[in-house]
Amino acid sequence: MAVIRGWDFPEDLYYQVEKHVWVRRLSADVVQVGLTPVGYELLRHSLTAISVRTKNIGQVVSKGKSIAMVESLKYIGPLAAPITGVLLRANERLQDDPDSAPADPYGEGWIAELQPLDWESESAALVTGEAAMTAYETWLSSEKIAWE
C-alpha cells in the first residue's frame, strides 16, 4: 500500500484519479467501485447520504453515467461509473451509515458492484500501480492540496 500525503492508496486497484474513484477487480465478471480518501476529504467527511440508484440494479450503466448520488453538507452530485457495466449490487450498509465509507473506503466503504462489459478496452483509461501513485501525486500538486 502506498501512502501519498497521508492517504492510503492500494497499488493493486485501478483509479480514475480526476474523479477520485477506485475500481477493484473481484473476478473477470465483477468489479467493485468506491471513492478514494481524497474524494471523501473533498466532501469534508460530512456525508449525509450515499445512495445507489437501486432501480437500476440489473441495468447497463454507461461509463460516465451516474451509478450513485453522493450528498454532503457542501455537495450533492453523481458518482460516475468509471466503466460500462451491468449494475449488480449496491452496498446497502451505506444507506443506513454513510459515514462508514470514509472510515474504510477500500473495505466496507465500497459503493457499487458492476459486471464490466468491456473491461479490456475501458480499463486502459484507468491507472494502476506506480502509474496511479504518480498520477495522484501530480494531481494533488497541481491542485495544491496538502491536507494530512
Residue ranges: model-predicted function:
Residues 86-115:
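Aromatic- and Lys/Arg-enriched surface recognition patch
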